[in-house]
Amino acid sequence: MTQLTRFQTALKEAGAKCALISSELNIRYLCGFNYTDGYLLISTDRAYLITDFRYIEAAKAAVTNFEIVMPRGNMLNEIKSLLEQNDVTTLLVEEDELSLAAHKRLSGVFEGVELVPGASVILKNNREIKLAYELDIIDRAQRITDAAFDHILGYITPERTELDVALELEFFMKKMGAEALAFDTIAVSGKASSLPHGVPSAEKLSKGFLTMDFGAKYNGYCSDMTRTIVLGRADDEMKKVYNTVLTAQRAALDALHEGMICRDADKIARDIITEAGYGENFGHSLGHGVGMFIHESPRLASGAPESSVLCRGNVVTVEPGIYLEGKYGCRIEDMVAIDLDGSVRNFTKSPKELIEL
């Protein structure tokens, strides 16, 4: 089964005839081709890739199962013609991606065609369940990320800045084969480590915790990992904070299984952190799905519905943290999957014992 046939099956099940896909990542997800100007028009039995002259040759070499169309004039007019040829009067669009301006533009061109939401829901549900090849690509992305962590431990010196560390991680990941970054790299030290999404500064590294949250993008798929180390020596409270986060993470990881209610994983980690006296200092959810998008479903969160359960093909992060405002913070993050045989696979191999440099 391909991502295209999965989508077409879901279209049929939804009672829909045709969908228009315009967002870059979803286009790549469905056809495997990375380009920035075009559309996919997918019906239950046909699929078109519409793009301009710049991408035609590459598309023909890379894409199968799609009819590749180069517009003779305006791209939207070409799509309108295809809609008319296929007797389409109702068109599913990506409700989560389409701006109001784009919606108005499409409505103005596609006269007599009703634009309805629904494509985003189908894609979200499909992306949540990875196929075997997707898990293999994510594993490769994480291997690049693990290698970057091993490298950075030998790079860090007191003369480095947070920005030095972030840029070195990024350079190394690209050197190892990453096509891009999964997200903006976080490398924050000392008091700045209390900011869960702190921005690296040009200041020299501060003593204390150094939190590094980074990931590679490989063949379109993301990895996501956080490690916190100590620059200098950890005092007793820092050791308590670190070990509490590590204990919470390991407990949640050990409990993960096929069929687990997602919010229960969050509760396991949160209860341990709360018991240690830091409940108010763990302000985000335990984890999120990862795929072509760095944040996907499912969510390991206290607010997740009871109906949200872990199933085969899910990839999630497990990333508890403790943040003491104006003092420091600590987060440890692994990325795991419920594998296709129902077992739990931890993609992340980097050490988690307290490291002092």
Summary of predicted features, one role per range:
Residues 1-357:
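Active-site neighborhoods and metal-handling regions in enzymes and metal-associated proteins
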